[in-house]
Amino acid sequence: FTQPCLTAMEWPEKRLTVYGAAFSGPEQPEGFLTGFTAPADGNIHIGLLHGEVDPAEARYNPIRREEIAASSLDYLALGHIHKRTEPLTCGKTICAWPGCPEGRGFDELGEKGFYSGTVGDDGRISLTFIPFARRRYEILTVDVTGREPRAAVEAALPAETALDLYRILLTG
């Protein structure tokens, strides 16, 4: 999407309409979803938006839960938050942030991946999280009181850590 307004792309043969919008600057204080309602035309309606739900400060496409419910979208795929959320249902709309597919630093900890969505025969969307990252960023606190530090760290590390990156905090 290239325009700073909600734009539709249609695939009639799949009964699918996808809506999205692009930021025209570093911030987007007005919400793209405000006043939008998908038509009741029997199609699957999916939104792709970079934004924040119920933000305290409106800087990056603020989206209110009431707007999500009023949108009548079947699924709203959200970006901006790099930490995965569990799917949230607002009205009939399911939405979620998958996070990012690969962590880039110690401010993006844990398992990373994406959501795979399925449209059922009844039109309902189901989401499954698919781990994707080759490595994880983790912070590990190790108490070394009365222990040899290296042995304590090695004992605290999970078995599968060869590709993972750890910030290790020693206490004690």
Regions found by a protein language model. Name each.
Residues 1-118:
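His/Asp/Glu-rich metal-coordinating catalytic cores
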